[in-house]
From Swiss-Prot:
This is PTS system glucose-specific EIIA component. Keywords: Cytoplasm, Kinase, Metal-binding, Phosphoprotein, Phosphotransferase system, Sugar transport, Transferase, Transport, Zinc. Pfam families: PTS_EIIA_1. The keyword Translocase does not apply. It comes from Staphylococcus aureus (strain MRSA252). Its cofactor is Zn(2+). Heterodimer with glycerol kinase (glpk). The EIIA domain is phosphorylated by phospho-HPr on a histidyl residue. Then, it transfers the phosphoryl group to the EIIB domain. The active site is at residue 86.
Length: 166
């Protein structure tokens, strides 16, 4: 009864869908050309070989971390799911060049909200790869993860993973 009175009884949804944060070609995690991601050292997920330079939020939640080098964003859902959107490979070395971050740490976001714009051609020419990993960094806290085998994905529209948190 007190929970209802004071609003602390909010039921957190354990199930969450992760949508494509980029438009492009779906890449299985094992096929990402970087062993840290391909061997799932950072967690389960997938990659996208983008065809355009805009990243949108793949989940509803909040921005947990904007990397100072602008190449990656950490997101957190209400149910505890933590997601890393990493734009390209070895892009940390670009030191923010070619990236424009549109959100700040602590911002609330919904699926499809723009997070980052980037110069696809610049990254293609100056980084190891434009293939962008999307990783569940707290995979160990998930009860189940169902990854759909897609081909082409559309940012904010194509559902790629269903996760149930513990």
């Amino acid at each position: 009864m007190f929970k209802k009175l004071f609003g602390k009884g909010k039921e957190v949804q354990k199930d969450i869908a992760i949508y494509a944060p980029l438009t492009g070609e779906y890449v299985k995690i094992e096929d990402i050309p970087d062993p840290v991601f391909a061997q799932k050292m950072m967690g389960e997920g997938f990659g996208i070989n983008p065809t355009e330079g805009e990243v949108v939020s793949p989940i509803a939640g909040r921005v947990d971390n904007v990397f100072p080098t602008k190449h990656a964003i950490g997101l957190k859902a209400d149910n505890g799911l933590e997601l890393l959107v990493h734009i390209g490979l070895d892009t940390v070395q670009l030191d923010g060049e070619g990236f424009e971050v549109l959100v700040s740490s602590g911002d609330e976001v919904n699926v499809g909200d723009p997070l980052v714009r980037f110069n696809l051609e610049y990254i293609n020419n100056n980084a190891k790869s434009v293939i962008s990993p999307i990783i569940i960094t707290n995979t160990d806290q998930a009860a189940s993860i169902n990854i759909y085998d897609e081909n082409a994905v559309i940012k904010g529209e194509t559902k790629v993973i269903d996760v149930t948190m513990n």
